């Protein structure tokens, strides 16, 4: 809680004038907001304005937020932070699995043999899950971490694919290329439960590994080893976080994780 009394914490409103933030009273700040809202609405119409609420707000505050924009401002331009964090997961999984929900519970960690964590730092962001993952790794299970950062879990990883930021799609393409090329697939499952296998197979086999290696900055041999560990494991689970979804490739990356 050191941030609470931190000297750099904002305690009074700031209004930018001539490119410089200047201190203002609360009345000045509220009057400025109101006057600008009115000016923009009169000049460009109500749809020139919009609001973004938050899942961290209670129902009452979110209700007031949407009511303000719809009834007072006169626009339906109201959204929430879930648009860039949860929605890519929901859409990606819906397109691949048919529903935007998790396929496993956290308790299934006990029954898995290999765990892949991509774009997530659960020991900091979700300590309970992070602790459960660490417990399983300490029992000898395999951990694959895909993250540009050296997170705490990366210290326990058997394979840390430290890719360049924004290259999730390329790296997952490499993994799928090796899995299909080497035949590390469960063909019976594919035949019975998937569609479009031949088109998918043709696409991933055409991946230029050398180009993907340059793009991601990850050695192809390390990617191949991680892909083999994941694909040949008797049971494997993957976890992804905001490092995947809060990205322009978010939905496509979630779809690739599902394909993997």
Predicted segments with their positions:
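N-terminal export/assembly segments and adjacent metallocofactor-ligating motifs
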Residues: 1-182, 196, 211, 219
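Short coil/turn segments at secondary-structure boundaries
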Residues: 44-53, 81-83, 187-193, 214-215, ...
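Internal, active-site/partner-interface "lid" segment
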Residues: 182-212
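Conserved phosphate/pyrophosphate-binding and hydrolysis machinery centered on Walker-type P-loop NTPases
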Residues: 194, 220, 246
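Core structural elements
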Residues: 201-206, 224-236
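A glycine-rich, hydrophobic/aromatic-adjacent loop/helix-cap motif
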Residues: 230-259
């Amino acid at each position: 809680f050191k941030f609470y009394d931190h000297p750099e914490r904002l305690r009074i409103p700031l209004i930018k004038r001539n490119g410089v933030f200047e201190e203002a009273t609360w009345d000045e700040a509220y009057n400025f907001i109101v006057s600008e809202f009115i000016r923009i609405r009169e000049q460009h119409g109500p749809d020139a304005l919009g609001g973004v609420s938050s899942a961290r707000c209670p129902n009452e505050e979110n209700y007031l937020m949407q009511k303000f924009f719809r009834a007072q401002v006169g626009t339906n331009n109201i959204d929430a932070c879930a648009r860039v964090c949860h929605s890519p997961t929901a859409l990606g999984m819906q397109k691949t699995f048919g529903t935007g929900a998790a396929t496993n519970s956290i308790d299934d960690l006990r029954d898995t043999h290999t765990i892949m964590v991509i774009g997530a730092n659960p020991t900091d962001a979700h300590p309970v899950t992070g602790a459960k993952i660490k417990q399983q790794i300490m029992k000898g299970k395999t951990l694959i971490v895909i993250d540009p950062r050296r997170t705490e879990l990366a210290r326990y990883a058997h394979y840390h694919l430290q890719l360049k930021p924004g290259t999730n799609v390329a790296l997952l393409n490499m993994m799928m290329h090796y899995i299909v090329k080497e035949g590390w697939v469960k063909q019976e499952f594919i035949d019975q439960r998937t569609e479009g296998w031949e088109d998918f197979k043709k696409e991933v086999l055409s991946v230029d590994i050398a180009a993907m290696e340059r793009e991601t900055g990850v050695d192809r041999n390390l990617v191949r080893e991680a892909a083999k560990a994941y694909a040949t494991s008797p049971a494997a689970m993957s976890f992804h976080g905001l490092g995947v979804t809060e990205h322009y490739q978010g939905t496509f990356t979630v779809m690739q994780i599902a394909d993997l």
